[in-house]
Amino acid sequence: MRTITVLGAGIMGVGIAQVAAAGGYNVILRDLQKRLVDNGISTIEKNLQAMVDCAQFSREQMEEALARIEGTTDLEYSGQADLVIEAVVENMAVKKQIFTQMDSLCPPHTILASNTSTLSITEIAANTHRPDKILGMHFFYPVPKRPLVELVKGLETADETIDITREFCARIGKISVVLNRESPGYLYNRMVLSLINE
């Protein structure tokens, strides 16, 4: 795996793009407007500079990470990736549309992941021709500082897809926990709500 596409240059997408680039991956950061993409890359640069200032990152590492990030508004170009991570609005209709589009644009080997924290992966994957290569990949805010990632299997998600994604998580310094079946709120949110209710 060499190239990661992140769809959505908001708070979560920017964080995911940052840790992927810092982990050595080439990153395509895509959003609907160039202004949003430029703002996202600017935020990543500021975040990395803060890490340099705190001696958590060298200037050379910062420059190398930034050089790996490419911004675009072209959805078709975004399909040239080994892993696509969708981080857009938490709306099922929007996510279904994006996954259908990416399914038609990406090579057959590409894994498609959603950063959703609650929505059904099985339903998101239903209109694609690669449900075995679709999973939930729930990062936590702020992404560069939170080590946990929930990997959520849909009904047809292949074990190989999970294995490849776990390897990616490890390389970017994340601890992954696998949910073998979907449940509302996944693992973390269910645990937090249970504690709050207690």
Describe the role of every protein-language-model region:
Residues 18-22, 63-83, 164-174, 178-182:
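Amphipathic alpha-helical segments at domain termini/boundaries
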Residues 28, 70, 85, 135-137, ...:
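Hydrophobic/aromatic beta-strand patches that form the interior of the parallel beta-sheet core
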Residues 96-148, 153-166:
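Rossmann-fold NAD(P)-binding glycine/threonine-rich loop
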